């Protein structure tokens, strides 16, 4: 039986940590763990998800929840409440709903203070890892029998009815997701016509019906090439010389978005090395299975720009294809011949040094799932028995997650993000007696997770920004600063610093607050918006160089509504507690941020959310930022327009429901059937409360609160619905804790600001 372990280094000599592994979450399979009744409960959850897999793609993430509830002997003792039609919502019923949520949240908190949860959704994380482990010969050791069984379960469960897989779990089938999943199944031991319900046969038919893997997008071509099922001649060039360009060059790596930079870094190394894994009998079989013509007859040069329409979210401009052709026809032949080959040798050495630097500064976690597999493979290519590769292997468990739909690979974990939101939700309830022990543990986790130092050495020469004082998305070992995680972590610690240390523990030192503020200020763009990871400032025209057909806006760092709004909230709280520290800079930040929000507001009054779905989510955040600086419905046209947007998109049942398709389409798209989504309902409710809707007409608030209250389940949980997160406008991320956090937060604000408190007799 599977179980989750917290903050455990497992005494592995190749693991090291900056804070004793606080926040680390790893799964292990123990054949002797659990009773038969508990195993049956897990199987029931798996079967239930399987039976409904085509209606609900996002898991409830119930396996670890079952484990924690058992271990803590949790039982919901507060009676469930419902609001009948025509009934006025009472303060006491909302209180009961909140207390039920809080009691469950307490049971789900890990010993180190965070809330475990999967952070998955893309259908291109686990597959490249399996490919790289197969190439290196470590697949069976890293993923023994039970691991393989659960990976296959995941692939079967998430397969679409037409036989393919999407870019993410809710997406329509595309070539990239389908070829990666097909190859993964074959590497895990399934035959060409194997798999549950003919999974491999259906997938191969989809691939061949859509032009074969020759029509794969560029990432698919690269992964197949390193496996030996495609040729480098059929890929656009990724010259490692990119990493030795002069800094004045417009396309210098220092000017790129960090994820783009760190994905193409190992890709360019492998390209420069013309790396290909061992050509095994299975690889030769795949060459026969995945093409509609003989492998040896393929004219690879003519296939470089082929991409099936299902994968073409961002078509290359003709000028970009002309650039690739120039590199392919003229530059590459030169760089592979003496004396220019000396330049390639230098470039490869520089590139692998950058890879090692990033590995060391993330404790071999790397910045994310895509980079992890590629950097690990580059290290293996350099030295198959080297320490670097062994350190990479030791960090694979940090990425693995097991749920009712099987074993998958995470983006890298949302521990800090979820914990900081959960603590603010708890504070909104004002249930001091119920939440005090939870707050103390959560406070300890957030304090222990703040990054204490900048990257090692001359980090600017390695294209890195400051990290000291920041918080990451996951844990301290990860090491990569993000502005919104820093602002949410800062908000929590500032709010908790106002409470008694006997209740929530010692507050952070002022210098730690100052370091966080310094990072937030450093990431404001010229237009007033806040960037996510590193300062943004390059001209947007460089986005025409986006080499990926699957994503949008990946070349440069960009600002976002959410990062800007949370930065405003955090700095307003900070300014009240530390009024003399960098006051003028903070006031300028707030003024410019307000101007940015007003400028990027959509015509219908909404704001586009970069990290959640989509206009509902972005509008909630923007209203929070505007409220923080004193903007009101009466004095701000932007707020009036935003309120109108929320009121006009409310559903008949009192909720809100927006489709993930809003993100790629960049226009509001409701859920099919005018359904509501509880997380979006909670976000919209909070947004309206931030505009003081209760002073104008509380009816929409009551209707939303009624839906939330009546949706609470017997144990205090809320049902899992559609996936809640998104990135780069076209791919989803699943945040299962959102259903607990945002519902609690919204109802806490509703009780505090909308309902009159009963008079004490």
Swiss-Prot record:
Catalytic activity: (S)-2,3-epoxysqualene = baccharis oxide
Annotated InterPro entries: SQ_cyclase_C, SQ_cyclase_N, Squalene_cyclase, Terpene_synthase_CS, Terpenoid_cyclase/PrenylTrfase
Keyword Isomerase set for record: yes
Gene3D superfamilies assigned to the protein according to its UniProt record, in alphabetical order: 1.50.10.20
PFTB repeats: 148-189, 639-680
GO biological process: triterpenoid biosynthetic process
Protein name: Baccharis oxide synthase
Lineage: Eukaryota, Viridiplantae, Streptophyta, Embryophyta, Tracheophyta
């Amino acid at each position: 039986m599977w179980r989750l372990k917290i903050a455990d280094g497992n005494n592995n000599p190749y693991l090291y940590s900056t804070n004793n592994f606080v926040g680390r979450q790893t799964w292990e399979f123990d054949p002797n763990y659990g009773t038969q009744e508990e195993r049956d409960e897990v199987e029931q959850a798996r079967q239930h998800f399987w039976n409904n897999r085509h209606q609900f793609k996002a898991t409830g993430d119930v396996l670890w929840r079952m484990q924690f509830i058992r271990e803590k002997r949790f039982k919901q003792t507060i009676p469930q409440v419902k609001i009948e039609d025509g009934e006025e919502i009472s303060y006491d019923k909302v209180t009961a709903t909140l207390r039920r949520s809080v009691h469950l949240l307490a049971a789900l908190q890990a010993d180190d203070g965070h809330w475990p949860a999967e952070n998955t959704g893309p259908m291109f994380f686990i597959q490249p890892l399996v490919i790289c482990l197969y190439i290196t010969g470590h697949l069976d050791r890293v993923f023994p029998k039970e691991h393989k069984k659960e990976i296959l379960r995941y692939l079967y469960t998430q397969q679409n009815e037409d036989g393919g897989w999407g870019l993410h779990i809710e997406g329509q089938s595309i070539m990239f997701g389908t070829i990666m999943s097909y190859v993964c199944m074959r590497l895990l031991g399934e035959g060409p016509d194997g798999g549950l319900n003919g999974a491999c046969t259906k997938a191969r038919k989809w691939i061949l019906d859509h032009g074969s893997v020759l029509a794969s997008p560029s990432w698919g071509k690269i992964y197949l090439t390193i496996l030996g099922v495609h040729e480098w001649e059929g890929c656009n060039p990724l010259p490692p010389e990119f990493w030795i360009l002069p800094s004045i060059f417009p396309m210098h790596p220092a000017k790129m978005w960090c994820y783009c930079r760190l994905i193409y870094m190992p890709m360019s190394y492998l390209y420069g090395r013309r790396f290909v894994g061992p050509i095994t009998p299975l690889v030769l079989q795949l060459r026969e299975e995945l093409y509609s013509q003989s492998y040896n007859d393929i004219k690879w040069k003519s296939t470089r720009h082929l991409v099936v329409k299902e994968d073409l979210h961002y078509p290359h401009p003709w000028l970009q294809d002309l650039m690739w052709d120039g590199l392919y026809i003229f530059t590459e032949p030169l760089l592979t011949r003496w004396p220019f080959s000396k330049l390639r040798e230098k470039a490869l050495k520089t590139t692998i040094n950058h890879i090692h630097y990033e590995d060391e500064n993330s404790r071999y976690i790397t910045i994310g799932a895509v980079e992890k597999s590629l950097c690990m493979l580059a290290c293996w290519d350099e030295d198959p028995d080297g320490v670097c590769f062994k350190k990479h292997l030791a960090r694979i468990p940090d990425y693995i997650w097991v749920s009712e739909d099987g074993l998958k690979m995470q983006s890298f974990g949302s521990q800090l993000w979820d914990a900081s939101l959960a603590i603010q939700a708890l504070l909104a309830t004002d249930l001091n007696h119920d939440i005090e022990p939870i707050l103390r543990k959560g406070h300890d986790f957030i304090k222990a997770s703040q990054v204490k130092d900048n990257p090692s050495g001359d980090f600017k020469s390695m294209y890195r920004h400051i990290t000291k004082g920041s918080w990451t998305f996951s844990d301290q070992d990860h090491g990569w600063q993000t502005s919104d995680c820093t602002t949410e972590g800062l908000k929590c610690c500032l709010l908790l610093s106002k409470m008694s240390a006997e209740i929530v523990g010692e507050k952070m030192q002022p210098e730690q607050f100052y370091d966080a503020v310094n990072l937030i200020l450093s990431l404001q763009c010229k237009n007033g918006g806040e960037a996510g990871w590193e300062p943004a400032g390059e001209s947007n025209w460089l986005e025409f160089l986006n080499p990926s057909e699957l994503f949008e806006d990946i070349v440069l760092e960009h600002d976002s509504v959410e990062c800007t709004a949370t930065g405003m909230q955090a700095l307003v709280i900070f300014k009240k507690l530390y009024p003399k520290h960098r006051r003028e800079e903070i006031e300028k930040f707030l003024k410019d941020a307000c101007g940015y929000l007003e400028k990027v507001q959509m015509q219908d009054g909404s704001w586009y959310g970069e990290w959640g779905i989509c206009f509902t989510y972005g509008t909630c955040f923007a209203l929070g930022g505007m409220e923080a600086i004193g903007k009101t419905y009466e004095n701000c046209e932007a707020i009036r327009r935003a309120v109108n947007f929320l009121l006009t998109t409310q559903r008949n049942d009192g909720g809100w429901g927006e489709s993930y398709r809003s993100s790629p389409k960049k226009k509001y798209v409701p859920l099919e059937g005018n359904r509501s989504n509880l997380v979006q309902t909670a976000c919209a409710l909070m947004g309206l409360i931030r505009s003081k809707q209760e002073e104008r007409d509380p009816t929409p608030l009551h209707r939303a609160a009624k839906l939330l209250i009546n949706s609470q389940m017997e144990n205090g949980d809320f049902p899992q619905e559609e996936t809640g997160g998104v990135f780069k406008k076209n791919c989803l991320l699943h945040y299962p804790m959102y259903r607990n956090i945002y519902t609690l937060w919204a109802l806490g604000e509703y009780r505090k600001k909308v309902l009159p408190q009963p008079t004490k007799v």
